[in-house]
Amino acid sequence: GPMGPSGPRGIPGPPGAPGPQGFQGPPGEPGEPGASGPMGPRGPPGPPGKNGDDGEAGKPGRPGERGPPGPQGARGIPGTAGIPGMKGFSGIDGAKGDAGPAGPKGEPGSPGENGAPGQMGPRGIPGERGRPGAPGPAGARGNDGATGAAGPPGPTGPAGPPGFPGAVGAKGEAGPQGARGSEGPQGVRGEPGPPGPAGAAGPAGNPGADGQPGAKGANGAPGIAGAPGFPGARGPSGPQGPSGPPGPKGNSGEPGAPGNKGDTGAKGEPGPTGIQGPPGPAGEEGKRGEPGPIGIPGPPGERGFPGADGVAGPKGPAGERGAPGPAGPKGSPGEAGRPGEAGIPGAKGITGSPGSPGPDGKTGPPGPAGQDGRPGPPGPPGARGQAGVMGFPGPKGAAGEPGKGVPGPPGAVGPAGKDGEAGAQGPPGPAGPAGERGEQGPAGSPGFQGIPGPAGPPGESGKPGEQGVPGDIGAPGPSGARGFPGERGVQGPPGPAGPRSQGAPGIQGMPGERGAAGIPGPKGDRGDAGPKGITGPIGPPGPAGAPGDKGETGPSGPAGPTGARRGEPGPPGPAGFAGPPGADGQPGAKGDAGPPGPAGPAGPPGPIGSVGAPGPKGSAGPPGATGFPGAAGRVGPPGPSGNAGPPGPPGPVGKGPRGETGPAGRPGEAGPPGPPGPAGEKGSPGADGPAGAPGTPGPQGIAGQRGVVGIPGQRGFPGIPGPSGEPGKQGPSGASGERGPPGPVGPPGIAGPPGESGREGSPGAEGSAGRDGSPGPKGDRGETGPAGPPGAPGAPGAPGPVGPAGKSGDRGEAGPAGPAGPIGPVGARGPAGPQGPRGFSGIQGPPGPPGSPGEQGPSGASGPAGPRGPPGSAGAPGKDGINGIPGPIGPPGPR
């Protein structure tokens, strides 16, 4: 028959009792570590976590692949300025430049009058011969100082014995190239020093034949070097100049030898497999520890071997022009010099491009007259400046009439003159006899030890080292003490129901309420590792998640048993990746004002004030201080050539001690040069004889060829300061030189701090009216003084009587700039002039105060989870307890 309808659904039976807990299966094979994900940004620090029980050290995992380098950090705050370095010693003078082409022959001038003969000075003690010092760097060529007045020609001194050549030092082995140090602060460029006196001219050689230039005379024997002098005082260091371009990269050093691998520790016995306990509650994240104290700096390392000669790097940019140094102290007046001999006219300078007229500046009102400031302390001698631009040639002087002087009586013996420059080469002389070998001189005294230099700037921080290889696995720690047995668990659910007899199908009831969740069953065995998936591409970083709220602290459990002592620390894990750079910090508080910066270079000249009406003639003031001697006048044209004197008879060749020098005879004609003989024995020096009358100057020789620039010599030890000489007499004032072309306008200088008002001096005694002196050379422009306070408007005075027109007085020193007046009407725009030369760059200011550290930036998005590490070693098996609900976790035991 047909199939009947289905019966109602039966009532669900009671839940079955859980089966007994199974034992944990053996650990599966560790899976291969996956590729490292990108480094996520650093999250905010969490609350401090509770100390968990010390677990057994797991096996160290394999180090992950090194991730890509993080972004470059923001540039740090510039450090404070270092200790100023000591002033370097002056470099050796550069090689003498080529002689310029001979200028046009000038008209013969009138012969000068012979000056009064000076007194014979005492003969100085010959100093010991100094050792050759280490070669110093070649100094930069400075600005040519003003030509000093020519001194009186002294008598020709006896030629000293030839010096012994110094021993050539052995060439050192080339060491590894050292790291390039940071550049020190750039020294301030000083103003050119006062001109030194010109050396006395040597005796004149015989004139050559008409039309033929005279040959060059033989060079004199080298003099004995003086004793080393004391080192000079340390000068102030200038502001730091701009950093030059980085030098060439040094050669990489040889890789170090690999270290010995440590012995592998004994492998411990594996412990029995323990039952996995329930997971403990998640500990709170620990706070970030406070930074540790700064370590004591280590002792300085030993000095390494000298580096190999590196290849010179590209030439750095020209340094900025330093601020002009203060004027040096006034020198003692020199002795009255005899009129110098006519020099060679200089070469014609290169004609510069004509400057264009600048735009017409606005004429400001005249400022108030500044008060005379107190004289400042004498500044240190300036470093040698750079060579200036060659000046324009002066106009050709008028031809003087030939003089008709009467020969005067022979003068008294003059003071010993300085060694003159080598004269023109004379004709070859006869071959001289071969002298005997000289005795070796005593060894020179050792020089004084130099001042130790300042500590160099800190070197650049090294690159982070590569991740180290994980160390060997340590011995397994002792097993922990067995804990107390837990409390009896709650009664478990009833056991499984027995078999029931099949009853009639009942009526389907209403669905019952949802039953309570059953107790979780035992953990199953770990499955086999699945196949390794293909590493996908690195995804973009996710958005920054908001930090979660801190959870409430759970109730404290009952006190647990005292734990065992802490196990041995496990092997160090691999180094983590560098975190991303923090966000830019907030600007720091305004720092205190730093010390006043150095005075800047002189600013451009201010606008020319309006021409005032001539005032009444004032009363005669006290006599002014003695001015500096003016620059030497221009060298006049060479005088007429004198007639050649008859040759003197040759003297006999002597071997004995040197006799007294007789009166100078007439200069004889030089023979062809003979072969150089061996050095003769050093004779005892004889007494100086009276100087002969100076001869007439010979004709100008042709310019010699430029010699090869030699290697700079080693720097000698500082010489012992000699005795102070007697103060010289006041020399005659030199004629004012021609005004050179205007120099380039410098950049405006940094305004210096306002100076103190000068105290009012006591009135000096009324002096007699001085005579009008010859105008001295124009001095360098002074620094722009601070702006004076605006004066109160004066009451209108009654018009005074018109006085006689006064003479134009000497231009005074530039006073401090007055306050800026009201802006005048805009004048008509003048024609645009050609671009002028570029000014020097300003001095770099001192570094500002360091800013406050920035706040920590927001945490970035968490990166993807890394691969799961290999399972740890199995623990000891525990005692089978009654299956109960786990109790609360006890507090941690003491460490």
Curated annotation (Swiss-Prot):
Keyword Iron-sulfur recorded: no
Compartmental location: Secreted; Secreted, Extracellular space; Secreted, Extracellular space, Extracellular matrix
Biased composition (Basic and acidic residues): 51-65
Biased composition (Pro residues): 152-164, 595-607, 741-751, 787-802
Gene Ontology CC entries for this record: collagen trimer; extracellular matrix; extracellular space
Entry keywords, A to Z: Calcium, Collagen, Extracellular matrix, Hydroxylation, Phosphoprotein, Repeat, Secreted
Modified positions (Phosphoserine) in chain numbering: 90, 556
Quaternary data: Trimers of one alpha 2(I) and two alpha 1(I) chains.
Similarity-based family: Belongs to the fibrillar collagen family.
Note: These protein fragments were extracted from fossils. The tryptic peptides required multiple purification steps in order to eliminate contaminants and to increase the concentration of peptidic material.
Function, as annotated: Type I collagen is a member of group I collagen (fibrillar forming collagen).
Protein name: Collagen alpha-1(I) chain
Name of encoding gene: COL1A1
